[in-house]
Regions:
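Phosphate-binding/catalytic loops
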Residues: 4-10, 20, 119-196
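Conserved active-site segments centered on acidic
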Residues: 2-104, 112-116, 192-196
């Protein structure tokens, strides 16, 4: 019969819990942000979910800096997502919060204005926030062996002008097509790098 030293087991458990508090497990969540959370960030969330598959340990969410709270996906964007077989019908726009930022490993925005707005509100999260297309672009520099979250947190490059994804809201079918295409192309580089 095996005897257990209960005191030693409790002491070890306390040490593990203390370590977890000091070094919490890395989040496996990506937050996408745009203005209204009805076009670009919503598209990124649902395309990322589709590309990563149901068995991925990564989760994806989206929010807006000026969200049209409770709204579904914008007209024309919905058609673009449907044509790609992307499931987005449960979407309800929401406003970005400190809690969403805290829970996320990375926050990928569509324009520099989104980055600046978030940093003004919550400067402590600056290292997590980058443009979506910027991450796709620098992935080629980093190589697949580099941890993407650590690499992006350490990245000290300003985004390039071409990293911006223009807002397609109320600009018609062509603007929606271009935005969704740019988002999808960026995510086809990012999702494999995450190992999702």
């Amino acid at each position: 019969m095996t005897q257990f030293n209960v005191g030693a087991l409790l002491k070890k458990r306390r040490r593990v819990e203390e370590e977890e508090l000091r070094y919490p497990p890395m989040s496996k969540k990506i937050l996408f942000v745009c203005t209204g959370n009805i076009a670009r960030s919503a598209s990124a969330q649902y395309i990322a979910e589709q590309l990563s598959g149901s068995d991925s340990e990564w989760t994806f969410d989206s929010a807006g800096t000026g969200a049209i709270v409770g709204s579904g996906v914008a007209p024309f964007i919905d058609s673009e997502l449907e044509s790609r077989g992307v499931n987005f019908h449960s979407h309800q726009a929401k406003q970005i919060t400190a809690q969403l930022l805290e829970e996320s490993a990375l926050v990928l925005v569509m324009e520099k204005e989104h980055l600046n707005w978030i940093v003004r509100e919550w400067p402590q999260y600056r290292s997590k926030i980058h443009l979506l297309k910027q991450m796709a672009r620098v992935q080629e520099q980093a190589g697949r062996r580099v941890n993407p979250v650590s690499f992006m947190h350490a990245l000290d490059q300003p985004p390039a002008k071409e990293d911006r994804i223009a807002d397609p809201y109320r600009k018609g079918a062509e603007a929606a097509r271009v935005a969704v295409e740019e988002i999808e192309l960026a995510l086809t580089k990012i999702i494999p790098w995450l190992g999702a």
